[in-house]
Regions:
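Flexible, glycine-rich phosphate/dinucleotide-binding loops
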Residues: 13, 153-154
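Short, small/polar residue-rich loop motifs at catalytic or cofactor-binding pockets
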Residues: 129-131
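Short, well-ordered beta-strand micro-motif
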Residues: 108-109, 136-138
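Short, gly/Ser/Thr-rich active-site loops of penicillin-recognizing serine hydrolases
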Residues: 66-70, 80, 85-93, 112, ...
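Short intrinsically disordered coil segments
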Residues: 121-125, 182-183
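Short, surface-exposed loop or secondary-structure junction motifs
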Residues: 1-122
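Short, well-ordered beta-strand elements
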Residues: 135-136, 142-151
Length: 189
């Protein structure tokens, strides 16, 4: 992950996206902040400030899907991965997301797609960012998704529901034309 930083180097500032915001009753978009170099800070929080690229974030999520390993290198133990993607709050509602979700160590976990009205599989784990970054890992479908928008306010568009619906439909269409098989026999007819 060569392009993930808390303090973006000045040499890479031309790769930082501007921040936009939705405004007014017609939902128009305007520039909020152009890319600027910020002096390095010393606070590295888990809640904000990390800058990355789609490619780097995808690699991280692929490592999570692989159980802590990427390209033959182990970064996290299977036990650590399991702790990160297991629900630790029981059947309590997740404040931000509502019913049908659980909470792991660093991820929101989709526990009940029906209650959550999501198109993803149970056990899908995901996280979002302040400027409508969304990424999820669906272990059942062996799928990683990353989308970055750089638009605020957060949650103006429900990317998790919208993008997961599109991805799920693509999987259904793929299965329709190339049905999965078990021992050579199609499992969908």
């Amino acid at each position: 992950m060569e392009d993930t930083h808390y303090n973006v180097p000045q040499s890479k500032i031309d790769r930082v996206a501007a921040v936009y915001q939705h405004t007014g009753p017609n939902n128009s978009i305007e520039l909020l902040r152009p890319p600027v170099y910020l002096e390095p800070n010393t606070y590295y929080g888990g809640v904000a400030g990390l800058n990355s690229t789609v490619a780097d974030y995808f690699l991280f999520q692929q490592m999570m899907l692989n159980g802590g390993e990427l390209n033959g290198v182990r970064f996290l133990s299977p036990r650590t991965i399991n702790l990160m993607i297991s629900n630790h709050i029981g059947d309590k509602d997740v404040y931000v997301w509502g019913p049908g979700y659980g909470w792991g160590l660093g991820y929101c976990i989709l526990m009940d797609p029906g209650k959550a009205t999501e198109h993803l599989s149970p056990g899908t784990f995901f996280w979002t960012g302040a400027y409508n970054t969304i990424s999820w890992v669906d272990p059942v479908e062996d799928m990683v998704a990353v989308a970055m928008t750089q638009a605020r306010p957060f949650g103006r568009v429900n990317f998790l529901k919208d993008l997961s619906a599109v991805a799920s439909q693509a999987i259904i269409e793929s299965h329709r034309h190339n049905p999965p098989t078990v021992m050579g026999y199609p499992i969908f007819r």
